[in-house]
Curated annotation (Swiss-Prot):
It holds the Pfam family CASP_dom. The chain crosses the membrane at residues 24-44, 72-92, 105-125, 159-179. Residues 1-23, 93-104, 180-183 are cytoplasmic. Keywords: Cell membrane, Cell wall biogenesis/degradation, Glycoprotein, Membrane, Transmembrane, Transmembrane helix. Homodimer and heterodimers. The lineage of its organism: Eukaryota, Viridiplantae, Streptophyta, Embryophyta, Tracheophyta. InterPro entries: CASP/CASPL (IPR006459), CASP_dom (IPR006702), CASPL (IPR044173). Glycans are attached at residue 48. It comes from the Eukaryota. This is Casparian strip membrane protein 2.
């Protein structure tokens, strides 16, 4: 009977250590997601390129703000980045006090909402960037990336960061769900 009790007491510190490790991983993933969404918003928000057409006086300017889907992308990534920054203190609190159930549940709900927002924004922006690269012959939309290399490279790069943030948010949701299930 003593060995059973001893096994239970030795299991509690191990469980607490695992819970602390999960909380530290949660914090690290949140910091990386902040960097990813913020970099995506900044890269897209500062994207513009000017192309002289016939003379230096007639120019074509490509800016992210000309396309509503890209504007939505910048705003959505900024919102998700701000949320992730605001969630960092709660993530730190989970490291200190690992028994918090309700705050983890709140994080799961808001993480899922932010995942939906960044998914919608990334999908809308991906459609526009695809059209910029490939065009659409049936709709008579020409591909513009042959002329606007910098614009297309920056928009594509910001999409990569945003899709990376989507993966990180999925991992955060799964991590929080596993931490709740262990309790």
């Amino acid at each position: 009977m003593d060995s059973g009790e001893q096994g239970e007491t030795s299991k509690a510190p191990l469980n607490k250590g695992v819970s602390r490790g999960v909380s530290i991983l949660d914090l690290i993933l949140r910091v990386i997601a902040v960097i990813s969404t913020l970099a995506s918003a900044i890269a897209m928000g500062t994207t513009n390129e000017t192309l002289p057409l016939f003379t230096p006086f007639i120019q074509f300017k490509a800016r992210y703000s000309d396309l509503p889907a890209l504007t939505f992308f910048v705003v959505a990534n900024s919102i998700v980045s701000a949320y992730l920054i605001l969630s960092l203190p709660l993530s730190i609190a989970h490291i200190i006090r690992s028994g918090a159930k309700y705050s983890r549940l709140v994080l799961i709900i808001f993480d899922a909402a932010m995942l939906a927002l960044v998914t919608a924004a990334s999908s809308a922006a991906t459609a526009i960037v695809y059209l910029a690269h490939k065009g659409n012959v049936r709709a008579n939309w020409l591909a513009i990336c042959q002329q606007l290399d910098s614009f297309c490279e920056r928009t594509s790069g910001s999409l990569v960061g945003s899709f990376g943030a989507m993966v990180l948010l999925i991992l955060l949701i799964l991590l929080s769900a596993m931490a709740l299930a262990r309790r």
